[in-house]
Amino acid sequence: MEDIQPTVELKSTEEQPLPTESPDALNDYSLPKPHEIENVDSREAPANEDEDAGEDSMKVKDEYSDRDENIMKPEPMGDAEESEMPYSYAREYSDYESIKLERHVPYDNSRPTGGKMNCDVCGLSCISFNVLMVHKRSHTGERPFQCNQCGASFTQKGNLLRHIKLHTGEKPFKCHLCNYACQRRDALTGHLRTHSVEKPYKCEFCGRSYKQRSSLEEHKERCRAFLQNPDLGDAASVEARHIKAEMGSERALVLDRLASNVAKRKSSMPQKFIGEKRHCFDANYNPGYMYEKENEMMQTRMMDQAINNAISYLGAEALRPLVQTPPAPTSEMVPVISSVYPIALTRADMPNGAPQEMEKKRILLPEKILPSERGLSPNNSAQDSTDTDSNHEDRQHLYQQSHVVLPQARNGMPLLKEVPRSFELLKPPPICLRDSIKVINKEGEVMDVFRCDHCHVLFLDYVMFTIHMGCHGFRDPFECNMCGYRSHDRYEFSSHIARGEHRAMLK
């Protein structure tokens, strides 16, 4: 056994340099030291002599050699591959640099250095890719979100969800101060301003404030139209603004000056009628009546209330001296009243010469003629309507129950001495028409009826009635109030309004 131990040591030292034959292993493993090589050479002779000493030495040799080969041979190859991976990044990026997804190509090309993306059609800058895609649908016409009930299509899902509420009738946003309910949050926000005293929207032309932005925009359109009027100079506009600030009645002044420029009014700006009261004038209204500037100021809250207060305050005695001045134009007071309160025109019917026919049924004509009243206002007698005869039959039935008897001159104007001071001006139009026309709904209730005496059209809605009356001209009922087109009769006027050919005739 003593001889076997050196043999085992010799064989183990001989087997160690075997893996060094591989060139890869030379790079990773160091060579044996010089003194170890000398020891091996000195022991080769006794080892060769004792090769046949025993089989145990061969078993030990095979066991150690197999284990060393399994450990040392795979490791240099694996280490060589793994050592090359950290230095192959440039090659990997060069391979992936040419690969781009199709959906990201427009994203990369349209994204500028500032962080926003530009539309390749119109150049609009968008803050995100989703906003850009929604914007591009306006160019392509794509509407992917469609309503399954009516077929309406939308570019965004939020618009579709808002549209669906129209079918369901859902109104989730409710006012905590009243019974108002709406489908959109911004509509509720605008409604809440009506309950507050704050008026955040102010006009830079005249200084008037409004609660709603839409009211301010409508007012600014009227102010711009007045400032751009070529008939008035800059000095007149500045003076008008000073008067406006001093008297606090810019609304009446703007309407007064707009009346002289009716033909230049835009078709997209219908007249706005203020007030909830429904009045009808039983007495004739003569457009020749003129008011002085001191008596012309009205309250800014309710225009209809201001008109009633002015007439009741002045009375017939104050109006008499003004009747004897027919040459004065009617561009000041009459258009203001007719533009804000059109029912006065419908009940009086002064432009088409109908007051003479109407008053014959309820006023006895005297034999004597006053010389001072021979002159008639040109606006009251010069323009005759083509359907005056038809109005005669209708009004005979409407006013045959009236028993008021007043003396009247030949020109159709009643004598102001006989006119009572308290005018009966507060009769609503439905009461005036119920004696002749009755409209009954399905519940059997009598509905309110509003009649246009110029067109012979009945309206069940007061708002539609006021809009229709705003289409009639101030001086001539068959003159379009939006473009100035003059019709020969009510049929041509109705056709003109139905076609809506106003923009081509604007000056």
UniProtKB/Swiss-Prot annotation:
Gene3D superfamilies: Classic Zinc Finger (3.30.160.60). The modification Phosphothreonine is found at residues 20, 325. Expression is restricted to lymphoid tissues. Expressed at highest levels in spleen and at lower levels in the thymus and bone marrow. First detected in more committed lymphoid progenitors and strongly up-regulated as these differentiate into pre-T and pre-B cell precursors. Keywords: B-cell activation, Cytoplasm, DNA-binding, Isopeptide bond, Metal-binding, Nucleus, Phosphoprotein, Repeat, Transcription, Transcription regulation, Ubl conjugation, Zinc, Zinc-finger. There is a cross-link at residues 61, 73, 100, 244 (Glycyl lysine isopeptide (Lys-Gly) (interchain with G-Cter in SUMO2)). Residues 1-85, 370-396 are annotated as: Disordered. One of its GO terms (biological process) is regulation of B cell proliferation. InterPro entries: Ikaros_C2H2-ZF (IPR050589), Znf_C2H2_sf (IPR036236), Znf_C2H2_type (IPR013087). It holds the Pfam family zf-C2H2. The modification Phosphoserine is found at residues 22, 42, 377. It is found in: Nucleus; Cytoplasm. Residues 33-46, 56-72 have a biased composition (Basic and acidic residues). Residues 450-502 are annotated as: Mediates homodimerization and heterodimerization. One of its GO terms (cellular component) is cytoplasm. A zinc finger (C2H2-type) spans 117-139, 145-167, 173-195, 201-223, 450-472, 478-502. One of its GO terms (molecular function) is DNA-binding transcription activator activity, RNA polymerase II-specific. Homodimer. Heterodimer with other IKAROS family members. Interacts with IKZF4 and IKZF5. Interacts with HRAS. Interacts with FOXP3; this interaction may be required for silencing target genes and regulating the suppressive activity of FOXP3-positive regulatory T-cells (Treg). Interacts with BCL21L isoform Bcl-X(L); this interaction blocks the anti-apoptotic role of BCL21L. Associates with histone deacetylase complexes containing HDAC1, MTA2 and SIN3A. Interacts with IKZF1. Belongs to the Ikaros C2H2-type zinc-finger protein family. C2H2-type 5 and C2H2-type 6 mediate homodimerization and heterodimerization. Transcription factor that plays an important role in the regulation of lymphocyte differentiation. Binds to GGGAA. Plays an essential role in regulation of B-cell differentiation, proliferation and maturation to an effector state. Involved in regulating BCL2 expression and controlling apoptosis in T-cells in an IL2-dependent manner. This is Zinc finger protein Aiolos. The lineage of its organism: Eukaryota, Metazoa, Chordata, Craniata, Vertebrata.
